[in-house]
Amino acid sequence: MAASVDQRPYPGLHNGVVRPLKPGPDIPRPKKLPQAPPPLSDSSSDEEEDTTLNLKDLIRKGTTEVESSIFDPRDDGTSDHWIQRNSSLVRLTGKHPFNSEPPLPRLMHHGFITPVPLHYVRNHGPVPRARWEDWTVEVTGLVTRPTCFTMEQLLHDFPSREFPATLVCAGNRRKEQNMVKQSIGFNWGAAAISTSVWRGVPLRTLLKSCGIYTRTKGALHVCFEGAEDLPGGGGSKYGTSILREVALDPSRDIILAYMQNGEPLSPDHGFPVRMIIPGFIGGRMVKWLKRIIVTTDQSQNYYHYKDNRVLPSHVDAELANAQAWWYKPDYIINELNINSVITTPCHEEILPINSWTTQMPYFIRGYAYSGGGRKVTRVEVTLDGGETWQVCTLDCPEKPNKYGKYWCWCLWSVEVEVLDLLGAREIAVRAWDEALNTQPEKLIWNVMGMMNNCWFRVKTNVCRPHKGEIGIVFEHPTQPGNQSGGWMAKEKHLEKSSESNPTLKKSVSSPFMNTTSKTYTMSEVRRHNNADSAWIIVHGHVYDCTRFLKDHPGGTDSILINAGTDCTEEFEAIHSDKAKQMLEDYRIGELTTTCYNSDSSSSNPSVHGSSDTIPLTPIKEVITPMRSVALNPREKIPCKLISKTSISHDVRLFRFALPSDDLLMGLPVGKHIFLCATVDEKLCMRAYTPTSSVHEVGYFDLVVKVYFKGVHPKFPTGGIMSQHLDSLPIGSVLDVKGPLGHIVYTGRGNFLVHGKPRFATRLAMLAGGTGITPIYQVVRAILKDPEDCTEMHVVYANRTEDDILLKEELDEWAKKYDRLKVWYVIQASIREGWEYSVGFITESILTEHIPNASPDTLALTCGPPPMIQFAVQPNLEKLGYDTQNNLLVF
């Protein structure tokens, strides 16, 4: 709803602009604008030269390290398919229209100036496809000289102003309001804010050149209208208005902007020209500006009345329509209010508590802003619910204009002791401006969910990031859009459960919890940790997954490895929405914390008990005898990266040390492990099969293909875990969990599949890409045993010859051992003399290179699902293989 800064509605096209063409054409705008007169210092600091240099430096610092925008596949089939966008932006309203904000850590990474590709976007419809050469802006209404200006006239015939300004959507932080009660707006997070350097023509200069009438002749309002065709009100442009006094006020720095951060505007941000009204909400800054109309009355546009209002809390949408609240002038939003947000610690950040971290201060950071040009004078942080406040250091590189106005956010930071954080229940922030405005402690709901500026609170809890140490995990109130997470979301979940179950006891108040008639303690859940009774905990709910063991596509181990534990992070990291819906069928009750005790190293005790003391003493590590095997299905084990070798431009060999140099890994042949890492503040878990022998002591090796971002158009961001691994310095520690999988090769042709024995004398082994690694382990195990006579026929498919992993080892084994045959298939040959197949796995290739179907032949496969579904299974069936019983998929 809230019309926000960088975005105005952009539905249809206007004034002869044609419908969008096929994807991929160049954006119809000049890469550089024609030479224009230097900007005036009309209302800037008198130090014009210093200011210009400072702006260039700010732009340079703020726009580095930004990946290229792409034609996002999510825009395919929409009228915006021709626009390149940054793939990291969080989409808030599905595919279309495009409304988005950057991830909060990405926004803050760039500091004071926001790169244009990361600037938040508010669009009501499709983006107009504009051309600089034929775009005009009409000034009409109560003026003596109505004029239609071309872009060249705006550029060359008028002085320009250039200055930094922060744009904020009136809906910034709306999702917090939606957690209390659903508003009529979508879920903006805390990053509906961005700062750019804007350049354009002063509005007052343009109006005076057209001879704006005096107040006595009725010129009381200045209306703005965009180019889009929108559905609101039965069909309209996007339009709004401001008072004449505001429009002509030289201290306001209102401009018709045609440049952002030194470049022409981008399509999402209003190309070729838009309004910039510093200190106002984004909803007044019309993009793709076509008309300026001087009128006696305020704008009659549908969006001027039905958007950007703060109505009293008792007014819902029905009452607002019935009693015409939308048309009451007292509730319109113009200037921004005071606001502040904590950005560091970020959501789900974990701060380990150890001898090193407790000796160092921790920096809490964030941003603050106010409206109307009012300076932010003070930011305070509390760790004790407002009993005491610590004053923050402000970083405000902006200089005021010569009227003393400030148009930009400020960044703030404060040092706190780690041990003080350990004893805190939450961190909260509030800001003050020069008018002594500050933020309310509690949220005040309104039907549009706008101008939310209550204290921003980050919750803290004690966790155990690694065996033997504790840490603090931080939780923001919400995550933007439809993303899950945030302490407010969990509290809302609990509240809904309480409403559906009036018998819920108030003492059961964990924010993770949703209660039914049955509750269980942690100690009860721990007892259900085997194939006879496998319970898990996800977000405080208890699930009995016993009857799903045999049906889990990842095998029984995938459940048993977490049975009897809280596996919320692991479940969220690797399961789809469909899987999450399926899980509800197995829900049997809720976890209660009223009888919680921390008698196990796997528990995550909280310091937020009912007393005022901090019960840290129960957090103890139980010393257990040294194990000869490192892997433990119930625990993650920390493993240190000790070497990294580049095999090719995108293939790496990683060696990780086990927790002790006298340990075996303990991974059965055919099973795999999970690598666990926090990437971009989210838990990432990926399955890998080590390539080192299961008999190696003290370490394991992984051969990993790195999927870099920007290489494959279908996966513009690349592989999350593989890129993370590639970036790790030597000495980094990752968590490993396992063993996982339902297939075990026990030797001499014998397998255990879902715990049931299988036997084969011949194996058809079909691999694709990185799916060679489990096949490789089985091959190694067979060849290592001179009495294992199992025949192996490997068909290994890849895109190119360069993509083939472990080729040297496979070829060497094939030459040395008669019982191993290897055949390669690549999609395209890049050199002459390629002696293997080109194309895809086909019936003819399998006929020639794998054994005939028989009772003592098994097919093993691992690779991309499309390969297995469309190449392996149908072609094996053509050869007479029983794929239901004799095809084993890793």
Curated annotation (Swiss-Prot):
Instruction: Detail which positions bind FAD.
Output: 686-689, 703-708, 715, 720-722, 773
Q: Where is the Cytochrome b5 heme-binding domain?
A: 517-592
Read off the PROSITE patterns from this record: CYTOCHROME_B5_1, CYTOCHROME_B5_2, FAD_FR, MOLYBDOPTERIN_EUK
Gene3D superfamilies linked: 2.60.40.650, Cytochrome b5-like heme/steroid binding domain (3.10.120.10), Nucleotide-binding domain of ferredoxin-NADP reductase (FNR) module (3.40.50.80), Oxidoreductase, molybdopterin-binding domain (3.90.420.10), Translation factors (2.40.30.10)
**Its catalytic activity?**
nitrite + NAD(+) + H2O = nitrate + NADH + H(+)
Q: How does it assemble?
A: Homodimer.
The UniProt entry, under CDD domains, shows: cyt_b5_reduct_like (cd06183), eukary_NR_Moco (cd02112)
Residues bound to heme? 552, 575
Where in the numbering of this chain does the FAD-binding FR-type domain appear? 634-746
Keyword line: Disulfide bond, FAD, Flavoprotein, Heme, Iron, Metal-binding, Molybdenum, NAD, Nitrate assimilation, Oxidoreductase
- Per its record, how is this protein called by name? Inducible nitrate reductase [NADH] 2
Q: How would you classify this enzyme at the top EC level?
A: oxidoreductase
**InterPro entries on file:** Cbr1-like_FAD-bd_dom, Cyt_B5-like_heme/steroid-bd, Cyt_B5-like_heme/steroid_sf, Cyt_B5_heme-BS, FAD-bd_FR_type, Flavoprot_Pyr_Nucl_cyt_Rdtase, FNR_nucleotide-bd, Ig_E-set
Which cofactors are named for this entry? Answer: FAD; heme; Mo-molybdopterin
What residues bind Mo-molybdopterin, as annotated? 169
Task: Provide the E.C. number(s) assigned to this enzyme.
Answer: 1.7.1.1
Q: Which SMART domains is this protein grouped with?
A: Cyt-b5
**What is the free-text note on the cofactor?**
Binds 1 FAD. Binds 1 heme group. The heme group is called cytochrome b-557.
Pfam (any one): Oxidored_molyb
User: Could you tell me what this protein does?
Assistant: Nitrate reductase is a key enzyme involved in the first step of nitrate assimilation in plants, fungi and bacteria.
What biological process terms from GO does the record include? nitrate assimilation; nitric oxide biosynthetic process
**What family does the Swiss-Prot or TrEMBL record give for this protein?**
Belongs to the nitrate reductase family.
The organism is Glycine max
Renumbered residue ranges of the record's region Disordered: 1-51
